[in-house]
């Protein structure tokens, strides 16, 4: 039932909306995270260690995923909810 809904036109709009939310969340979180580290600790990107890149990248991914999951609920209701009568 879920796969059938996702393959419909509304399902494709829902998936596109999720992709848009993830991209927006990732760009905002990236800007805040990377900019915060550079401002707070005065460490330019050229001086970052590999572990700093890994930690910051995983933090960006996790936060973006959380925001996407949270916004998937209203998007799912809007796009995949039942038909109003």
Curated annotation (Swiss-Prot):
Alphabetized InterPro entries for the sequence: DUF2534 (IPR019685)
Listed Pfam families: DUF2534 (PF10749)
Main localization (coarse): membrane
Phosphoprotein found in the keyword field: no
Membrane topology, as annotated: Multi-pass membrane protein
Origin: domain of life: Bacteria
Compartments where located: Cell membrane
Example of a GO cellular component annotation carried by this entry: plasma membrane
Statement: the UniProt record of this protein carries the keyword Metal-binding: no
Keywords of the record: Cell membrane, Membrane, Transmembrane, Transmembrane helix
Record field: transmembrane: 14-34, 60-80
Name used for this protein in its record: Uncharacterized protein YnaJ
């Amino acid at each position: 039932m879920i796969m059938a809904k996702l393959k419909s036109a509304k399902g494709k709009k829902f998936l596109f909306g999720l992709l848009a939310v993830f991209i927006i969340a990732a760009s905002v979180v990236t800007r805040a995270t990377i900019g915060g580290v550079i401002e707070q600790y005065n460490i330019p990107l050229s001086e970052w260690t590999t572990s700093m890149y890994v930690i910051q990248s995983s933090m960006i991914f996790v936060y973006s995923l959380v925001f996407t999951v949270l916004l998937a609920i209203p998007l799912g209701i809007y796009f995949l909810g039942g038909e109003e009568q």
